[in-house]
Regions:
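Short amphipathic alpha-helical segment that frequently serves as the phosphate-/nucleotide-binding helix
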Residues: 17-22, 130
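Short acidic, S/G/P-rich loop/turn micro-motifs used as interaction or catalytic elements
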Residues: 12-14, 48-51, 88-92, 103-109, ...
């Protein structure tokens, strides 16, 4: 059964991006310890955010190299962490979705576990995250909220 977690990640996009990089690192390390590398889709709000987090993943987390790529970069080898955004089709069976976009993708139930990043900025992003929480409830999923 799919699991959805809503995680508060600060009050700005910059803090949320750093939080997402740390979360990718934690999930990646857990899978390394199990000798089974899970596939992670890091879904951004748009192409600009995707490029920003692509650069940030070379720095965060410190002391850990995480092979990653933008999903539409055909010149890069396959990686266990792929960065996407709306309008870019994902075709792999990912284990985890880390969603920086306040709206859940229509295929969010295809992931073993979803991490919805919530920026507490009292803006439309936070309202859209609330709507995503309600969508989960409507779909019969009781999400976990971690503040």
């Amino acid at each position: 059964m799919e699991k959805v977690n809503f995680l508060t990640a600060g009050q700005s996009e910059e803090v949320a991006l750093r939080f997402a990089c740390d979360l990718v690192g934690k999930l990646y390390l857990i899978s390394l310890k199990r000798d089974q590398i899970d596939l992670i889709n890091l879904r951004c709000f748009d192409a600009n955010q995707a490029h920003a987090i692509d650069k940030l993943l070379w720095q965060i987390p410190e002391n850990l190299f995480i092979p990653h790529k933008l999903i539409n970069n055909k010149d890069s080898k396959d990686c266990k962490v792929e960065i996407s955004y709306p309008g870019i089709r994902t075709i792999k069976n990912y284990d985890f979705l880390i969603n920086l976009n306040p709206q859940l993708p229509s295929n969010y139930r295809d992931f073993r576990e979803t991490y919805q990043i919530v920026i507490k900025d009292e803006s439309s992003f936070q309202e859209k995250a609330r709507a995503s929480y309600k969508k989960c409830l409507k779909d019969g999923i009781k999400p976990t909220y971690i503040d």
